[in-house]
Amino acid sequence: MDLSKYKNKGLTGLQNTGNSCYINSCLQLLSNLYELNELMDNLENKNVNNNENGIILSEWNSLRKMMWKENCIVAPLRFCKVVQFVSKKKNNELFSGFDQNDMSEFLFFIIDCFHNALKREVNMNITGKVKNSLDKLAMSCYEMMRKMYKKEYSEILDIFYGISVTIIKSKENDNEILSNSCEP
């Protein structure tokens, strides 16, 4: 990834429109995730679902482009109205008005919208030979991912989601794995 295109750009402030400071904080964070910017820059090659999630992703992409076009102050009024509309449509009253809210809750909401806008069915194949216990663990993690996300995969999973691995080892033999589990 060529980070030079970001040098001295994206130094844009967001004007507070009511109690939107939690939204503005989240937008600044998302705007400076270069992996997300790369994905958004290549959206023309992706099919965006034509629903409320697609609306919010499209509106975010427009605002993001404006934020990176020149260093200035932007009032994200249209984006906030789209968030309120989508929030009401999803029966999520939390972001449907002008009440103060928690930035982390909004971040989960917006990431979920992005994922649902891009999700699609994919064919996930796992190849290779298991040579050691680490390979075996990796295979079980990939198998879990294949089962969970083959019908609704998006690149958002690659950027924002991880895998939690729990390993229980033998007390007598540290090399003996009694159990392991992989969870998203």
Predicted segments — roles?
Residues 1-184:
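Deubiquitinase catalytic domains
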